[in-house]
Amino acid sequence: MIIPSIDIEGGRAVKRIRGQRGNYIFQGDPLELAARFRKAPLVHVVDLDGAEAGGLVNISVISKIAEILEGRCELGGGLRSLEAVERALSLCQYAVVGSLPFKNWPLFRRAAELYRDRLAVSLDYRGGEVLVGGWREKAASIAEAVRRLEEAGPYAAVIVTSVEVEGTGGGVKADIDVKSLKRIARRVFYAGGVRDCNDVERAYALGFDGVIVGYALYAGDLKKCANWY
């Protein structure tokens, strides 16, 4: 499964290089992108401002995106309360949490109990360390994170993002044990550095069930492997 992403900052769709604010390869209309990706099986939507603020910020435009996509989306970015998770699930098929398991374990566990079939966990990492709070804080090693997540799983999905190559088209960089992730989630997705269909195939060969793409949509080429593109 190839999943296009729409990252929202200040009401606009952007693609940051390595997640750095002000360092973009793309800026545009998120509603136009949603219409363009309407035939995709799933769209990954991130509230970048929300990830930094700790709560959904761009809810108005995200609501319109979800309406265009008829709910075929997964939404993350600042979901650090049960209310925020439920708000995301009222718009999209899945809610994506990254900081919550490391910032508030009891609340995360409760969310998993209530919504495990619609809850995805995002592991954004660099140098073997999971990053949270808009990629500004180190939370745990990947191995420690997986051990902790096993306690409350399984989940609908785990999303692995290689921050080092995110937004660069630098190729797949996934030095992580995919098999260990498949023990805690139905599906495991990869994001970061994907430029073209060769990178997509490499991710599949490593055992990932799907690939989230951003850079490849604006500066790469997916025409041979994405029938919605």
Curated annotation (Swiss-Prot):
| Gene Ontology biological process | L-histidine biosynthetic process
Of the GO CC terms on this record, one is:
cytoplasm
Which residues does the entry assign to the active site, renumbered to this chain?
7 (proton acceptor), 124 (proton donor)
Family to which the UniProt record says this protein belongs: Belongs to the HisA/HisF family.
Record-annotated disulphide pairs? none
Record's superkingdom?
A: Archaea
Q: From the UniProt record, list the reaction(s) this protein catalyses.
A: 1-(5-phospho-beta-D-ribosyl)-5-[(5-phospho-beta-D-ribosylamino)methylideneamino]imidazole-4-carboxamide = 5-[(5-phospho-1-deoxy-D-ribulos-1-ylimino)methylamino]-1-(5-phospho-beta-D-ribosyl)imidazole-4-carboxamide
* CDD domains according to UniProt: HisA (cd04732)
- Please report the organism this UniProt entry assigns to the protein: Pyrobaculum aerophilum (strain ATCC 51768 / DSM 7523 / JCM 9630 / CIP 104966 / NBRC 100827 / IM2)
Q: What class of enzyme is it?
A: isomerase
| Gene for this chain | hisA
> InterPro entries from the entry?
Aldolase_TIM, His_biosynth, Isoase_HisA-like, Isoase_HisA-like_bact, RibuloseP-bd_barrel
Annotated EC:
5.3.1.16
Name of this chain's protein: 1-(5-phosphoribosyl)-5-[(5-phosphoribosylamino)methylideneamino] imidazole-4-carboxamide isomerase
Q: Where in the cell is it found?
A: Cytoplasm
Keyword rRNA processing present in the record's keywords: the answer is no
